[in-house]
Design a protein with these regions (language model features):
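Helix-coil-helix junctions within alpha-helical repeat/solenoid scaffolds
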Residues: 248-447
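Internal metal/ion-chelating core segments
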Residues: 149-253
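Tandem amphipathic alpha-helical repeat scaffolds
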Residues: 25-27, 53-67, 95-104, 126-140, ...
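Flexible helix-coil transition and linker loops at the boundaries of alpha-helical arrays
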Residues: 10-12, 80-92, 119-121, 152-162, ...
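Generic helix N-cap/helix-start motif at coil->alpha-helix transitions
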Residues: 17-22, 50-52, 88-94, 121-128, ...
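Inter-helical turn/loop elements of alpha-helical hairpins
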Residues: 2, 15-20, 25-42, 46-50, ...
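Alpha-helical repeat scaffolds
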Residues: 40-43, 71-85, 108-118, 142-155, ...
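Asp-box/WD-like beta-propeller blade repeats and closely related beta-sheet repeat scaffolds
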Residues: 111, 115, 121-124, 129-134
Length: 447
């Protein structure tokens, strides 16, 4: 033991204050999305080359991006961290246990390992951040809330990352349909000076699910400075996704021009650095297509910048489904069929969570989307309605998975499953107040 502890009282196995400070700055970047943490982690390694945690943090950060091209770098960092475990303390070794499971594709097992770590280390924000991220990727709404709830009473405003932990909790509450509590916690997270994009995001989700599209547009405009530049850096790394939410509020108002403006500002093809940004772009363009909005060359630009070789498939069914949407939207029917085959094969050959998801949900969902793209709307409707009750398995949020629901409504309207479409619309109308978009679907399904 070195006697050093981090800002939240967790013992660390480095004797270098510089290494500790750099690692804590990297953790803040992970939770705030202000700048990539890799430079800070490199600084921590330079200050103490024998400390395993910065290498583990780099591995976890890269794995969390679900980016196929970064997997090799992630595994290399994890290998270095494992070689240095002799000097690591019990908490740091527990992170390595979770990361090994994560690297092997066992997302649920990794989440359980982080939960076990948090029992004895309730203020380990790294375990909270990573556990929360993969709860989100697994669509586990209950654990998004419960993981943070189990430790939140051990936190207070005295701890610098407390607002960011509140942001995690707010999102977990929202995904658990506890909308009033979620909004209150999200607003509380933003009551001080901390800029917490995840809390802004949680409140935006509340407003989306409640059909408060005008409130949502005002909210995003009011909090814009909190996901802008900080200390001369580029805009917040979460800006693309928050811009996606801004576009959804515009769509709910049937402001198609506003949605396209948000797309061009926050999700243009030349600004995409990772697959998660391309996923948001594909989801938004698809929703516009469902409404009959002309999007110009945006589909083609999106696909042109998206690495979609066979080696890119199989890491995340959620990402693979959105890549298929992009190919269909761009009119690349041959490539779309090839992508389904590659993603299905990669899923079957893989291990862990993604293999199960691709087999149970991803592959049949992709076949339904291909049918939709081919104009076989009844086949698409039959495929999608059979999957909807288990759609959370795909991962992501309620708002993100609504693209499947809207595709199903469109298939019913365009094909002969009109009675099914009306029943699904009735279900939707009971859950959300009237908005221009909801009324548009009512007219479409009554035609």
């Amino acid at each position: 033991m070195t006697g050093l502890v981090d800002a939240h009282g967790n013992a660390v196995s480095t004797a270098s204050r510089g290494a500790l400070e750099s690692s804590e700055r990297a953790l803040w970047r992970m939770m705030s999305f202000y700048g990539a943490p890799t430079d800070d982690l490199d600084a921590a390694v330079a200050a103490d080359p024998a400390w395993s945690l910065p290498h583990a943090m780099k591995a976890g950060f890269l794995l969390g991006l679900t980016e196929p091209s970064l997997r090799g770098d992630a595994l290399a960092a994890l290998a270095v961290a494992e070689r240095l475990t002799g000097g690591a303390n019990e908490r740091e070794r527990a992170h390595l246990v979770a990361l090994r499971l994560l690297a092997a594709g066992d997302w649920a097992g990794a989440g359980a390992a982080w939960n076990a770590l948090l029992v004895d280390n309730p203020r380990d924000a790294l375990a909270l951040q990573w556990g929360h991220l993969f709860d989100f990727y697994r669509g586990d709404a209950a654990m998004l809330r419960q993981r943070v709830a189990r430790v939140l009473p051990e936190w207070s405003d005295d701890f610098p990352l407390h607002p960011y932990v509140l942001g995690l909790y707010a999102f977990g509450l929202e995904e658990s349909n506890l909308h009033g509590e979620a909004e209150a916690v999200g607003r509380h997270a933003l009551a001080g000076t901390a800029r917490v994009p995840w809390a802004i995001h949680a409140v935006a989700h509340v407003m989306e699910m409640q059909g408060r599209h005008e409130d949502g547009r005002r909210w995003m405009a009011h909090r814009r400075a909190d996901w802008g530049a900080l200390d001369g850096e580029l805009r917040n790394g979460f800006a693309g996704h928050l811009g996606w939410h801004e576009a959804l509020f515009a769509l709910e108002s049937l402001d198609h021009a506003g949605a396209l403006t948000a797309y061009d500002a926050f999700l243009p093809a030349d600004a995409h650095e990772i697959t998660l940004q391309r996923v948001d772009a594909a989801s938004l363009l698809w929703r516009l297509d469902l409404l009959g909005v002309e999007v110009g060359p945006r589909w083609q630009a999106l696909v042109a910048g998206w690495p979609l070789g066979d080696e890119a498939a199989g890491q995340s069914a959620f990402n693979d489904v959105h890549a298929l949407i992009a190919l269909i939207g761009a009119g690349e029917s041959r490539r779309a069929r090839a992508w389904v085959a590659a993603a299905t094969a990669a899923g079957a050959a893989g291990a862990g969570w993604n293999r199960a998801v691709m087999g149970r949900l991803g592959a049949p969902l992709m076949h339904g989307l291909v049918a939709f793209g081919q104009g076989r709307f009844d086949a698409a409707a039959d495929a999608l309605v059979a999957l909807r009750d288990g759609a959370a398995l795909l991962g992501g949020s309620h708002a993100q998975r609504d693209v499947i629901e809207q595709t199903l409504l469109s298939a019913c309207a365009r094909g002969s499953r009109h009675a099914l479409g009306r029943a699904l619309y009735n279900e939707r109308s009971m859950a959300r107040p009237a908005t221009p978009l909801r009324d548009w679907w009512a007219r479409r399904l009554s035609a």
